[in-house]
Amino acid sequence: MKFVDEAEIQVIAGNGGDGCVSFRREKFIPLGGPDGGDGGDGGSVWLVADENLNTLVDFRHERIFKAQRGVNGMGQQMYGKAGQDKIISVPIGTVVINVQTDEVIGDMVRHGDRLLVAKGGTGGLGNMHFKSSINRAPRQARPGEQGEERTLKLELKLLADIGMLGFPNVGKSTFIRAVSAATPKVADYPFTTLYPNLGVVKIEAYSSFVIADVPGLIEGAADGVGLGTQFLRHLQRTKLLLHMVDISATADAYGNEKVGVGLLPIEQVRKLEIELERHDPALLDKPRWLVLNKADLMPQEEAQALAEALIAELHWTAPWYLVSAVSREGTWPIMKSAMTLFEHQREVAAEQSVSSR
């Protein structure tokens, strides 16, 4: 199934039922008073987070969602039945935006979270409410109120533990295939990955985490160039960023790039850091490890020397790894270290939760 992470829908709440104009008509009571009942309230539209969904693809086929209208009031003070609510299931991680105001009105982060997105109209009053000392037989009733109507933009942010980032063709999809059961498309041209791919990495029988292969970024991504900001947002909820670099991208004797993604390794790092900072500076505060890929394309000693020179030039202090995603060499230690990091993060969060009570 293709991953669809954005959709636009229209939600229409039900109108309230109209109030009724009616009078008692019973034997021996020729001048019965007003007994018109109220209309029922219109149904509302709700979004509910569902852990069993992981895509917005269903909204490509169904875009308009309507709740039921309230039933009109009736005589003998009978109230109209309320309209049935419309429940729309969305994946966990869905951000809800009001298109008219560009305001974020909800963020569905837990299974079962409910968000009211269109409130049903209130039912109208029947004529029994308008009786007074000077108007014993009112012939007026109030119509039901109109239900709310909105156009919503749904954006899905992946709930992954690890986000992989890097320029196109550095080997992200190959890496995720190597460490998980995911099978993203792999080919030797840019933007092979057009949708984020999720892979589950199992370390032990009961230890696992989710890794997201986000489509390749290019210079100007923060401004929407290439696949743009629609995928940068997926990195915001991750616990760890793996910054993949093609270590085989080298220059010839004249200084012209001749191998790899078209950028020297140090440029791959610095240019992508600029894009992250422009999109969301908080991304640079996340744990970020450097993964130097394609070490298999050169002798081992040369790859190690290039890697150490790059780390020194960057003044890199965070963890870094020299790997070959194709042969899987060096990939597994990264996953084990990531699991150790996540366990530590959970322990710290638990301690902070206890101390704040």
From Swiss-Prot:
GTP binds at residues 166-173, 191-195, 213-216, 293-296, 324-326. The keyword Endoplasmic reticulum does not apply. Residues 1-159 form the Obg domain. Its cofactor is Mg(2+). Keywords: Cytoplasm, GTP-binding, Hydrolase, Magnesium, Metal-binding, Nucleotide-binding. It holds the Pfam family MMR_HSR1. Residues 160-343 form the OBG-type G domain. Mg(2+) binds at residues 173, 193. GO terms for biological process: ribosome biogenesis. One of its GO terms (molecular function) is GTP binding. Its EC number is 3.6.5.-. It is an enzyme of class 3 (hydrolase). InterPro entries: G_OBG, GTP-bd, GTP-bd_Obg/CgtA, GTP1-OBG_CS, GTP1_OBG_dom, GTP1_OBG_dom_sf, OBG_GTPase, P-loop_NTPase. An essential GTPase which binds GTP, GDP and possibly (p)ppGpp with moderate affinity, with high nucleotide exchange rates and a fairly low GTP hydrolysis rate. Plays a role in control of the cell cycle, stress response, ribosome biogenesis and in those bacteria that undergo differentiation, in morphogenesis control. Monomer. Belongs to the TRAFAC class OBG-HflX-like GTPase superfamily. OBG GTPase family. This is GTPase Obg. It comes from Xylella fastidiosa (strain 9a5c).
